[in-house]
Amino acid sequence: MKPEIHPEYHEITVVMTDGSSFKTRTTWGKPGDTMRLDIDPKSHPAWTGVQKLVDTGGQIAKFNKRFSNFGLK
């Protein structure tokens, strides 16, 4: 492999929706960062069979604001 063309590979902590956490190695973020999951295998509809609306960061509100002037009422 060519030297110095690959991203840095380091350890981070992943926190799942139920609060449990584990350490993994990745190229995401910086060494020691924490990744908090909004959806994981314990809460994803594909594995739980339960439908759930997830609006992270007001995405629906942002969409409605952006397209409110089209006037389809």
Curated annotation (Swiss-Prot):
Keywords: Ribonucleoprotein, Ribosomal protein, RNA-binding, rRNA-binding. GO terms for molecular function: rRNA binding; structural constituent of ribosome. Part of the 50S ribosomal subunit. The keyword Metal-binding does not apply. Belongs to the bacterial ribosomal protein bL31 family. Type A subfamily. This is Large ribosomal subunit protein bL31. PANTHER family: 50S RIBOSOMAL PROTEIN L31, CHLOROPLASTIC (PTHR33280), LARGE RIBOSOMAL SUBUNIT PROTEIN BL31A (PTHR33280:SF6). The gene is rpmE. One of its GO terms (biological process) is translation. One of its GO terms (cellular component) is ribosome. Binds the 23S rRNA.
